[in-house]
């Protein structure tokens, strides 16, 4: 894929970024390098390779879910300034 400075300026315009001519030229060089690398990677035959989700094949050791805290809802609602039907009432902020 080939880009030119017009393409870089168009992308910058769509992103609402102001770029000078020098910045567009520098960005063009960087983007062309990135796109060239992508083209090289796409040219590699990966038909016999299984895709990997992570660089290391590690499984996580899972633990059982255990309740570590008791339900303190009633205690917390007893010290709240205003509660109705189990819900905390707060002052109206927006009119």
Curated annotation (Swiss-Prot):
Matches recorded under Pfam families: GatC
Recorded catalytic activity of this chain's protein: L-glutamyl-tRNA(Gln) + L-glutamine + ATP + H2O = L-glutaminyl-tRNA(Gln) + L-glutamate + ADP + phosphate + H(+); L-aspartyl-tRNA(Asn) + L-glutamine + ATP + H2O = L-asparaginyl-tRNA(Asn) + L-glutamate + ADP + phosphate + 2 H(+)
This protein's record includes keyword Calcium: no
EC class: ligase
Record's keyword terms, sorted: ATP-binding, Ligase, Nucleotide-binding, Protein biosynthesis
GO molecular function: asparaginyl-tRNA synthase (glutamine-hydrolyzing) activity; ATP binding; glutaminyl-tRNA synthase (glutamine-hydrolyzing) activity
Enzyme Commission number: 6.3.5.-
BP GO terms, sorted: glutaminyl-tRNAGln biosynthesis via transamidation; regulation of translational fidelity; translation
Transmembrane listed as a keyword: no
Function text: Allows the formation of correctly charged Asn-tRNA(Asn) or Gln-tRNA(Gln) through the transamidation of misacylated Asp-tRNA(Asn) or Glu-tRNA(Gln) in organisms which lack either or both of asparaginyl-tRNA or glutaminyl-tRNA synthetases. The reaction takes place in the presence of glutamine and ATP through an activated phospho-Asp-tRNA(Asn) or phospho-Glu-tRNA(Gln).
Subunit structure: Heterotrimer of A, B and C subunits.
Family designation: Belongs to the GatC family.
HAMAP family with a match to the protein in the record: GatC
Protein name: Aspartyl/glutamyl-tRNA(Asn/Gln) amidotransferase subunit C
Species, as recorded: Methylobacillus flagellatus (strain ATCC 51484 / DSM 6875 / VKM B-1610 / KT)
């Amino acid at each position: 894929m080939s880009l030119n400075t017009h393409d870089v300026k168009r992308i910058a315009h769509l992103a609402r970024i102001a770029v000078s001519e020098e910045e567009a030229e520098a960005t063009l060089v960087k983007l062309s390098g990135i796109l060239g690398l992508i083209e090289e990677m796409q040219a590699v035959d990966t038909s016999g390779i299984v895709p990997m989700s992570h660089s290391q094949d590690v499984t996580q050791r899972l633990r059982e879910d255990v309740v570590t805290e008791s339900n303190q809802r009633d205690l917390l609602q007893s010290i709240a300034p205003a509660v109705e039907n189990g819900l905390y009432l707060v002052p109206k902020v927006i009119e």
